Amino acid sequence: METPGGRPRKSACFPLCRAPGVFVFFAYIAAPLHIDELEQRKGRRGRMELKVYKDTVTAAESICDTKLELPVETEMLIPDYLPQVFKIVKCFVYLVVLQKQVTAGRLTVDGYLRCVVYYQSEGDESLCQAEQKLPFTKQVDVKPGSWGPATVLVSGETEYVNCRAVNQRRVDVRGAFALSIEAVAEAQGEVITALAGGGIQQRTTSLTGSKTVGSQEKLITAEESIAFDAPPEMVLSTQCTGAVNEVKLVSGKAVLKGEIRAEVVYRTAPGHTLVHTTRQIPFNEILDVEGAAEDCQCFAVVQPTGCTITGGSGEDEGENTISATAALYVKVYRPVEYMAVSDAFSTESETVLTQQQVALEEVADVFTQQVEAVTTGQLPDENARIIDVMATPLPMEVIEQDGEAVLRGRVMAHLLCINALEEIDCYDKVCEYTLPRRYPRPAADVIAQCYPSVGSVSARKVGDDTSAAIVLTVRGIVSFRSTQTVLADVQCTSPLVRDDGDIALRIYFAQAGEDMFDIAKRYAASPEAIAAANDTGSGILEAPQRLLIPSAT
């Protein structure tokens, strides 16, 4: 064999075993003469040209997770139209959130604490009720950044409350309320979706998540007439629960239908004999949600914030109207999937990879679940008689059991009893429950928005044993938070310098479970070329196999 200059070209071929399980073959051919070095450099620059294609993805980011303490300090004056105080029975503190918004790097929560005092009156010793609102506004800093729509969760429970009668018309209330605020926002980021040119080889991965199209909150009012078997002398409580029964998404709007169930507890005469009356209050609302479409999915919940009963006058005298206010919350989202490059190398050039962590949130479950919580035990006064029972649901939490995430909640039962002195006492008992839903994720990777409400409550005493059964309805949405490593940038630098001499062919003994891409990256060869040379697939190997690794040159 001769070169263009007339000189003989030297050639040789011989095998060489370099490492156990890998055989390589040398094929030596002398370099040709009279080739312009400038043209070689131009060709190398052309081979190193790399095209990078990027796309914008929506990533989830926790921007606030804090706990605050709200003081409960007030002097409640009993109006003249209510009986005087003989004995304080129980004091409740309820959280009512009116508005949540993120602006200028701060999260603002507006609302009030509804302080309700039950007392036994002077004279006829009847059960009475008085209440007062304690407004608050709290601002907290959020994580710096440019954020999209944010989901804000606000919950809380009473840490302690002390209530005493200063005199027959003045009640002093002192306590603290624990407020929990969590916020998860969406941030826009870029990922590499494809690479081309420069002998680049790439491995892609699928990123799945849920993109919030929009969310909206609105205070609504629903009214309905209500009839009582006998005129109430005093209304003691109006416990409300709500449900969204139908949701329809149209262009830029969400049409919702549902109802609010109001349970009115009252007495018709002096004393402590209580009567319960329930009323369903339907509502229809249309909320503007920019970007909402029929192919989107939706989670909606209604949380009652208050209820009033007014009597008729004039021609409507004798007719009563019940009016319920509630916070209607709607979240519209759409499942999304992105393809991102997670690894890459070049068969022609040295590559520099820059990685990044992408956090995604994916809606995994939207549910309405009924659950029963039961508590048993003995009352402090063995002669006490139960006259009524109420219940207060407490915030739910995500816990981990046997490597899975479960939703656990607590509810407090309040038993109103007549003691041996014919006075009214209230005994509290907390009971726990877990929902029969399990998620194959660590608890730290699960985001749960849960809204428990009490459907019914009953209590009975048999001998010395007392039991209370509470039926709750929990509405919620559960999302999984995941983090994946993908490439943020890829650069081809200098031409690839191979340190394997003039090896023309290798034999590699691959094991089951190895990825063809990893094998190809080790030898800077094309995965498709290796698969074609061995008549096999280019993914994960299912069984041990001997592979021929062709030269990349």
Which residues make up each language-model segment?
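Intrinsic disorder/low-complexity segments
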Residues: 6-8
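Intrinsically disordered, low-complexity segments enriched in serine/threonine/proline/glycine
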Residues: 10-11, 26
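Primarily a LysM-type cell-wall glycan-binding module
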Residues: 494-532, 537-553
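Short, Lys/Arg-enriched N-terminal segments with co-localized hydrophobic residues
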Residues: 22-47
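Membrane-lipid interaction segments
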Residues: 43, 49-502
